[in-house]
Amino acid sequence: MTVLVSAHRGGAGNNRPGENTVAAVERAVRLGADYIEFDVHRSPAGRLVVGHDAPTDESGVLLSDVVAALGDRAGAHVDLKLATGEHEAVAVVVAALPLDRIVVTTSEDSSIPRLRAWSVEHAPGLMLGLSTAARSHRGTRPSRWLAKTAAWFPRARMRRAGVDVVVSHQLIARYWLRSWARRRGLPLLVWTVDGTDALRYWTSDPHTWMVTTNHPDVALALRPH
């Protein structure tokens, strides 16, 4: 099985101003990235926009424009940064792409059952993954620390959510989550892998489904053919 390559934040690499832009997506598609990863937020006015950080104005790139730039080959790796109304963002992607080219990830536990319920009618078979990234938390400092600590031990969370894909930081995947995913027959999506040695390792791993990287050109060159 060939490990798929997902271009993180549109595959802009070290070009931070170019992250999550239509130009970055188009470049990653030309490179041959299998999927393009992008973060989805809601602007202050309620528009669905793409960008790493929560928007403070209306200058963000529209989600619909990024999806249109994927063309007819690359898949969408939709990383939701929304705690409510998630289905509205996913609906934009589902309207434009076939389901076998979409994977939706989030760090919000409650998003998975809501999206699952929505998908039964609107997108049956939609792949949903809960990330080991820390959940958003605005509580006290101890509760925020607990949320970050829990991110390193996500198996119970993933089991309760009923995920279709295990979305893991590369260190957590290497030490214990990869074997857990394998025992349950779940595909493994590893993030964010940038070093040459690490890319060579993960793109050759028979138990990995997808690797997210800021350098899709390097990953594609190292991936066994």
Pin down the residues of each PLM region.
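Phosphate-group recognition and catalysis centered on beta-loop-alpha active-site segments
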Residues: 1-225
